C-alpha cells in the first residue's frame, strides 16, 4: 500500500554550481553545433577546476566551433567575472580534447537507430500546475530566485548555491513545507545576520507558496555559517553529475543516463524527454493522477524493446489500455521523437540549469499537453465520460 503521510525532500542547485557550469558549457557546445549543422553528432563533456575548463568528447560536424570563446562566454553569463569569486571567465584557461564519433556507432544511428542501449523514464503528477512533484518544483523556485536576486542587485550573493525543500504529505497530497535549506556563496564581508535577512526576504518569501509555509517551517540558511569559497575553486565540476536535480528530484525513477552535451540521437536524452511528454499528457488527459513511463532501446534499433506505464493505482481506465494508447498516439523511434518534439534546434543550454522538466518556456516542446485529447480517446476515457455525462 502506498505511503499516505510522509516527508519527501528534493534539492536544486544554481547555475553557478560547478557541476551545472559544466552542464551549461556542454550544452552551449551542442547548441553551437546545431546552429550551423543540425545533423551534427555531439557527445561533449566538461570539467572545471580552479582557473581552467576542459572540454572533451566526440563531435562529428561541419560546424566551426571556437571552444575557448564559447566556454568563457558561458562562464561570464553565469556570473564568474572576478578572481574574488574564485573563478574568472576572462582569465581561465580552456583545454580542448575533441575527437570524432566512432563510425561503428554512426552506422546504426545514421539509419534511424538508437544511439545506445538503455532505459529511460518519464514522470508526471498533479501536485503542481506544471504537473511536477512539489518538492523539486519548489527547490528549483528557490535557486532560480537566488540567481534572480543576485542579478537584480543583491551583490552580497555569489553564483554558487543550493536549495533543499522537504514537503509534508497528508493523505498522499502536499500539505505544507516542513524544511527549507539554502546554502549560498556570498561576499566575504557580509555578516550572517545580513545574509539570513536577505535570503529570507528576497529569496524564500518570493519563491515559495505562502499557503504552504507556516510557523513550524524550519528555515536553514548556510548551516555551516560560511560559504565564501565556491564554484570550481571549492568543488570540481563535471557534466552529468546532477541527474536527479535535472529530472524529478527523486520522486520518479531515473535510467542513469545524463542529458547535457548529448545531441538528440542519444536516447538518454531524447527518449527521457519523450517519456516526460507522454506522462504529462496522460495526467493532463485525466487518465491518472500520477504516471511513470519507461522506454528501453537497443543500440542501432529504431523501435523500443519495451514500453511500460505505471499509474500507481490512480488510473481511471485499465493501465493496459493506457499503454496501448501510448503506442498508438506517440511515435517512439528516435527519428519520430526528434521530429515530433522538434529537437534539432539550439535550445539546450537553457535546459542545463533549474531542471529539464516542469518549465513553461515554449522551447520546451516536451512540456506541451497537445496529445491529451487523442490519448483520452484512444484509451476510451472519452466514452466513459460521455456515458457518465461528464
UniProtKB/Swiss-Prot annotation:
Pathway: Amino-acid biosynthesis; S-adenosyl-L-methionine biosynthesis; S-adenosyl-L-methionine from L-methionine: step 1/1. The keyword Magnesium applies. Mg(2+) binds at residue 19. Its EC number is 2.5.1.6. Residues 101-111 are annotated as: Flexible loop. Binds 2 divalent ions per subunit. Binds 1 potassium ion per subunit. NCBIfam families: metK. This is S-adenosylmethionine synthase. The gene is metK.
Amino acid at each position: 500500500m502506498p505511503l499516505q503521510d510522509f516527508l519527501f525532500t528534493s534539492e536544486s542547485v544554481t547555475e553557478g554550481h560547478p557541476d551545472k557550469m559544466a552542464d551549461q558549457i556542454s550544452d552551449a557546445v551542442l547548441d553551437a553545433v546545431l546552429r550551423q549543422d543540425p545533423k551534427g553528432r555531439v557527445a561533449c563533456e566538461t570539467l572545471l577546476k580552479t582557473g581552467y575548463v576542459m572540454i572533451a568528447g566526440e563531435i562529428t560536424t561541419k560546424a566551426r566551433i571556437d571552444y575557448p570563446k564559447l566556454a568563457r562566454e558561458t562562464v561570464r553569463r553565469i556570473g564568474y567575472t572576478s578572481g574574488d569569486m574564485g573563478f574568472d571567465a576572462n582569465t581561465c584557461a580552456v583545454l580542448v580534447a575533441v575527437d570524432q564519433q566512432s563510425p561503428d556507432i554512426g552506422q546504426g544511428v545514421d539509419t534511424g537507430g538508437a544511439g545506445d542501449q538503455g532505459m529511460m523514464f518519464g514522470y508526471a503528477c498533479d501536485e503542481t500546475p506544471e504537473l511536477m512533484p512539489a518538492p523539486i518544483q519548489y527547490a528549483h523556485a528557490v535557486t532560480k530566485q537566488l540567481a534572480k536576486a543576485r542579478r537584480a542587485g543583491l551583490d552580497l550573493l555569489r553564483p554558487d548555491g543550493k536549495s533543499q525543500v522537504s514537503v509534508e504529505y497528508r493523505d498522499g497530497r502536499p500539505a505544507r513545507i516542513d524544511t527549507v535549506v539554502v546554502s549560498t556563496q556570498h561576499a566575504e564581508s557580509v555578516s550572517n545576520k545580513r545574509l539570513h535577512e536577505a535570503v529570507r526576504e528576497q529569496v524564500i518569501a518570493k519563491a515559495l507558496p505562502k499557503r504552504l509555509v507556516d510557523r513550524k517551517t524550519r528555515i536553514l540558511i548556510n548551516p555551516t555559517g560560511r560559504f565564501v569559497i565556491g564554484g570550481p575553486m571549492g568543488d570540481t565540476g563535471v557534466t552529468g553529475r546532477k541527474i536527479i536535480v535535472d529530472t524529478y528530484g527523486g520522486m520518479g525513477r531515473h535510467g542513469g543516463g545524463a542529458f547535457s552535451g548529448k545531441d538528440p540521437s542519444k536516447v538518454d536524452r531524447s527518449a527521457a524527454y519523450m517519456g516526460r511528454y507522454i506522462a504529462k499528457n496522460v495526467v493532463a488527459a485525466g487518465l491518472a493522477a500520477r504516471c511513470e513511463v519507461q522506454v528501453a532501446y537497443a543500440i542501432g534499433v529504431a523501435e523500443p524493446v519495451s514500453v511500460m506505464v505505471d499509474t500507481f493505482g490512480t488510473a481511471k481506465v485499465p493501465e493496459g489500455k493506457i499503454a496501448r494508447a501510448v503506442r498508438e498516439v506517440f511515435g517512439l523511434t528516435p527519428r519520430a521523437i526528434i521530429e515530433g518534439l522538434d529537437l534539432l534546434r539550439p535550445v539546450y543550454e537553457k535546459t542545463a540549469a533549474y531542471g529539464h522538466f516542469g518549465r513553461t518556456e515554449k522551447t520546451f516542446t516536451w512540456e506541451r499537453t497537445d496529445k491529451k485529447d487523442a490519448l483520452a480517446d484512444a484509451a476510451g476515457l472519452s466514452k466513459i465520460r460521455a456515458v457518465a455525462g461528464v
